[in-house]
Amino acid sequence: MMEHKLLDALDAGAIGFTSSRSNGHKLPEPDNRPVASYHASWEELSQLVCLMGKTGRGVFELSREREARSPDPAVRKAANDRLQELAVKSGVPITFGIPAGSPGTADALAMLDSTAEAGGRMFGQTHTRGISHVLSFKGRLQFDDFAEWARVRALPEDEQRKIFSDPEQRKKLVAATKSGVYRTGGGEPRKPNYENMYVMYSAVSRNPTVAELAAQRNVDPVEVMMDLALESNFNQLFMQFDVATVPKNDEEALATLRHPRTVMTFSDSGAHVSLIMDSSIHTHLLAYWVRERQAFSLEEGVKMITLTPAMAWGFTDRGILRQGSIADINVFDPATIAPEIPTIEHDLPAGARRLKQKSKGILATVIAGKVTFKNGEHTGALGGKLLRSSAAGVM
């Protein structure tokens, strides 16, 4: 049945298929069960990938198992050897996320090269800054599941402000954060790491951490968060990075971004619209890594967000300005292009919450030859269409 479904999807223009072996992909608590693909045998997965290889079409994308990031080199090697063997045997391009700063980062980058040398195709997906959760008092906080906090957070904002301003109430709320049990999986905020949680004043440059501001003010980090919320009418955003996916410094990030077999494209925003905002990694690349750090030339930066991903995913009709290619074009000012601070919107069905992030410095966006955005405003033109692929990646 699975084989027939896969072939039908490829015939309909699917780019390939994905699977998750990550223990972090779980159903919401209290269920907390892993997604179904987590239990699939490696033999079953290999059979599907090899079937796709026989068609000469498709890319296989994998959310990898924890063994790939194990602190034990032997465990990492076994996981990498198995994946490389599949890439060579099937002939299918295989792609997965390579977070900078992980114990398995260097091994994964080396595997990209050794796979190519062995005759396989493999490319890694990288990030310009690392996956983070965007938290706020208008949105989601790590403490919201605790009874003491849930009671307060269910109140209107005016009532919440009174409680967050009351010294005795603040003590109770701070105490609750010390004893509560935090979520460990799924798409929910993790336990606070105040040394790795940043107060989002800028969407480009480095921001102070909650821990740094707490030390300056000589108060508990949770009190800093309350104070900043009160000072900003609850609009202040906080970014908490996953310590397993965030680079410790610029050099670690550049090691993944500069590798010739990686694509700057890793994002989880589509799955977690109210918690994660990675759609700005392209403007972040141009603002931070190209303009501010000058780690890449403008031409290199543009190629990283156009031709490189197009070729990796098998789209030979776009990603470059030439006669006959699809006219998907952004016209931007290199001196000002940058992501803006995200905002929280309630425009999903039933008023559900999502994060929205705009950019500045983009003068016009052209989709299939139609100007769809001009100076940040939608023109009414709808040039986009569902992308279909009939060829595998060529990296």
What are these regions (language model features)?
Residues 2-28, 33-34, 38-40, 44-53, ...:
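Active-site neighborhoods of metal-dependent hydrolases
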Residues 53, 88, 117, 215, ...:
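Hydrophobic alpha-helix feature that most strongly marks membrane-spanning transmembrane helices
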Residues 386-395:
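Short, solvent-exposed cationic patches
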Residues 13, 125, 218, 268, ...:
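Divalent metal-coordination and catalytic microenvironments
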Residues 237-248, 253, 297-302, 310-344:
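Acidic, glycine-enriched loop/beta-strand segments at the rims
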Residues 203-204, 310, 354-357:
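Short loop/turn motifs at secondary-structure junctions and domain boundaries
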Residues 251-262, 281, 331-385:
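C-terminal cap of metal-dependent C-N hydrolases
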